[in-house]
Design a protein with these regions (language model features):
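Glycine-rich nucleotide phosphate-binding loop and flanking beta-alpha elements
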Residues: 29, 70, 303-304
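Long, positively charged, glycine-interspersed low-complexity recognition regions
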Residues: 1-10, 45, 58, 82, ...
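Short His-Asn-centered micro-motif
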Residues: 23, 64-66, 75, 278-279, ...
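Long, positively charged binding patches that form subdomain-scale interaction surfaces
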Residues: 198-281
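Non-catalytic, alpha-helical, charged scaffold/linker segments
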Residues: 93-228
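Extended charged low-complexity segments that act as oligomerization/scaffolding linkers
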Residues: 17-21, 33, 38, 46-74, ...
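Conserved aromatic-histidine-acidic binding/catalytic patches
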Residues: 13-14, 39, 60, 73-76, ...
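Metal-dependent nucleic-acid phosphoesterase active-site entry motif
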Residues: 2-43, 183-199, 251-252
Length: 330
């Protein structure tokens, strides 16, 4: 190779895809404190500046999840909420992981297209990410929206995604904020109740049998999304009953969102403690980020559950608990 063709370290970094790094909410709180009071949090400030430089250089991306947005949105102290929202909107560049329905439908469609050797692919290789913050919950054109969002409003949000995220998280009427929080919490609590009831109902079963039961229940709970996935690839839903349901079993086994929820839920059920709403938020978070992140920095409990379930190896994601470890990893 001619010496003129040798890439510099900075050129080489730009030629490589940015690493996807997911931070759970407590890590974001640490960074926000380093923004507000750098002299009180010198080590976190060093890390903050390190991450800012990596984001600016295009070497990492720090997308948020619906749970991140919820946790920030629910803070009652306006100043604290603004500081955290500003930190997240700036470092994430308003990028979010898409919501449960879009992810599950697309993942299932990809699995079905491979199972049935059908010519179908998601056109956008970066489909799982969006810079419309609301798409962490549902698509902007989702027919389930009670009030459709006017196109000129969406255009403004697309033009100024960080400001749109900041305005949503830190501003707006308090009654609307509280209503959104209650709706999110209700969904998490419904999942918690289901898992607790299933744990009691199948207490004497082996883990293998509980895995089979949970697989069936997942398909039943998500069948409208799975039918939509079959429609996307042009596959009649009835075909999934072929070979005594082997396709349905493969669907649960190969669809990341379903697999992760099943495996972590089984680990949760096996613990000798009550299951809390916070567990459901973490469960949804891990189901969202594990298939698409290069590094996940989260709390000990769910990191350990994911490791025990072999999910880090399954998806090739680094599972970390110490925010400062990123300096040596990245």
């Amino acid at each position: 190779m001619d010496s003129a063709e040798v890439l510099s370290p900075s050129d080489l970094a730009l030629a490589q895809p940015a690493k996807i790094v997911y931070l759970d909410q407590n890590k974001w709180i640490d960074l926000a404190r380093a923004v507000a009071a750098p002299e009180d949090h010198p080590e976190d400030r060093i890390l903050l500046e390190f991450l800012c430089a990596k984001v600016e250089a295009g070497q990492i991306r720090l997308p948020l999840t619906a749970s991140n947005l919820y946790e920030t949105h629910k803070l009652n102290d306006p100043e604290q909420r603004f500081n955290l929202a500003h930190t997240q909107a700036t470092l994430s560049r308003a990028e979010v992981f898409r919501g449960h329905r879009r992810r599950l439908e697309t993942e299932a469609a990809l699995v079905l297209s491979k199972l049935y050797k059908m010519e179908w692919a998601e056109q956008d290789p970066d489909w799982v990410f969006s810079t419309l913050f609301l798409e962490a919950h549902m698509e902007a054109d989702d027919p389930r929206l009670e009030t459709p969002i006017p196109e000129h409003v969406l255009a403004l949000m697309r033009a100024y995604p960080q400001q749109a995220m900041l305005d949503h998280l830190a501003g707006g009427p308090d009654d609307i904020r509280r209503a959104a929080i209650s709706k999110f919490e209700a969904g998490c609590d419904a999942l918690r109740v289901d898992i607790e009831a299933r744990r009691i109902r199948h207490e004497g079963e082996s883990e293998s049998m509980r895995r089979k039961i949970y697989s069936v229940l997942l398909v039943l709970d998500q069948q409208d999304i799975l039918i939509a996935a079959a429609d996307r690839v042009g596959l009649p839903w009835e075909r999934l009953k072929d070979n005594n349901g082997s396709a349905i079993r493969a669907l649960v086994r190969e669809t990341p969102t379903l697999l992760i929820e099943r495996e972590i839920a089984l680990k949760l059920e096996a613990q000798a403690r009550p299951i809390h709403v916070n567990d459901m938020r973490d469960l949804r978070n891990f189901s969202t980020v594990l298939p698409y992140a290069d590094i996940v920095v989260a709390e000990n409990q769910f990191t350990n559950l994911a490791r025990q379930a072999g999910l880090g190896d399954r998806f090739g994601v680094g599972l970390e608990t110490d925010l400062r470890s990123l300096i040596s990893i990245l």
